[in-house]
């Protein structure tokens, strides 16, 4: 399993890349492996306010649909349209081309609740 050291993680298998007051969000390599072949993605609307630990997106496989939870509270700044057109990119490149959305977070203290790579590795 690929678990990049420079990212933060959630217990629900989302990854977060912090950049100033913005955070890029996707699902982990472990999550995409468990979900198997991603066939459809529903992303939040740009400008939508999201709350930490609340559903923000949906990833569907041939087996089932999985809620993707926002790791931080804030406003959706950008969504990755390429995963809407080609959802399989989430399986192929979960940490790069397969990211889901970028959020402008509103509570920096919530970052402390995210897991470091080693803690996430122990979780899975």
From Swiss-Prot:
Listed GO CC annotations: cytosol; glycine cleavage complex
The answer on whether this UniProt entry bears the keyword Secreted reads: no
Q: Which residues form the Lipoyl-binding domain?
A: 22-104
- What CDD domains does the annotation carry? GCS_H
Any note on cofactor binding? Answer: Binds 1 lipoyl cofactor covalently.
**Residues bearing the modification N6-lipoyllysine:** 63
In its UniProt record, which GO terms are filed under biological process? glycine decarboxylation via glycine cleavage system
Keyword list (alphabetical) reads:
Lipoyl
InterPro entries for this protein: 2-oxoA_DH_lipoyl-BS, Biotin_lipoyl, GCV_H, GCV_H/Fam206, GCV_H_sub, Single_hybrid_motif
The free-text function statement in the UniProt record for this protein reads: The glycine cleavage system catalyzes the degradation of glycine. The H protein shuttles the methylamine group of glycine from the P protein to the T protein.
Member of which family? Belongs to the GcvH family.
Q: Which HAMAP family match?
A: GcvH
Name by which UniProt lists this protein:
Glycine cleavage system H protein
**Name of the encoding gene:** gcvH
């Amino acid at each position: 399993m690929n678990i990049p050291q420079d990212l933060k993680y959630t217990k629900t298998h989302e990854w977060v890349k912090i950049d100033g007051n913005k955070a890029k969000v996707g699902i982990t390599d472990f999550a995409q492996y468990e979900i198997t072949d991603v066939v459809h993605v529903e992303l939040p609307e740009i400008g939508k306010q999201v709350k930490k630990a609340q559903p923000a997106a949906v990833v569907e496989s041939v087996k089932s649909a999985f809620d993707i939870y926002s790791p931080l509270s804030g406003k959706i700044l950008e969504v990755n349209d390429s995963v809407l057109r080609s959802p399989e990119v989430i399986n192929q490149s979960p940490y790069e081309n397969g990211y889901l959305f970028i959020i402008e977070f509103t509570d920096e203290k919530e970052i402390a609740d995210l897991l470091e790579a080693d803690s996430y590795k122990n979780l899975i």
